[in-house]
Amino acid sequence: MFVLGVYGHDARIYRFDRSGVIVSKAFNYISSPEYLGEFLWRLVHPENSSPGIIGSDTTITRPTSKEIERMLAIVQRHHPTLEIEDAKFRQDSRWMDVCWSPLCGGHDSSVPRGRTRCFAIGPPLWQSTNLFSRATVVWRVVIKGHEDKLYALKDSWRELCRNPEVFFYERIQKFKGESEWVGLAKFMGSLNLGDGQGKPSRHRTSSATLRTGEGSLQDRSHVRTLTYPVGHQLSTFTSTRQMVLGLRAAIEGLVFNLWSSNIILKPL
């Protein structure tokens, strides 16, 4: 995200990402208008002739009006009990790039492994509003061409000094095998958008690597993780019994899956 700060006849350009901010030297936009002009030109002329402006995410797009009508009919047919306002469906739904690569069996084998597209239904289920953070957003999605199941998609900016989520799912898989994962979502795939094979990427932070000391530990990469099934917020349960059963399942997932695999969950 870019911000232009104007202070009398002087200006500075600020470039924010999920790890920090890069600030230009102050320049006089009256006597040296070429700096501001070049910035604005480059802003709307990204490299590689990609659409949009510099920093825009080309892996997430708005559906067309025809796609909205088609996907609305598909979602209503496959998930008639799903409650979502028609206006929010039309306004907030998105197409997003994901990766389908389940670790274990019991999944839809008709979905080709690798990068694919999913349809995010309506507004996010949960969203972090902090700028300098993982900025986690959780969507409810269906896989394009395989809309009979709902999945949870977590979009976040992971610190590169930390292990990816698939590491922990693989560890649980090693200890649990093909047995039932009680109280724990199943890993369906992960897409590291910041893995540019050594090339600069708009899905990697830049400010952290410019710091001295341990600044590189704050470097982040844009990751999307797909899991199944989709959970419910505690506030949406219709009875105390239903809520208690949900809490019990979460505790079982912690004890039988994480602790038995020698994994300690940080928030706990």
What are these regions (language model features)?
Residues 1-222, 226-229, 233-238, 245:
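Intrinsically disordered, low-complexity terminal regions enriched in charged/polar residues
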Residues 237-268:
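Conserved kinase catalytic-core helix
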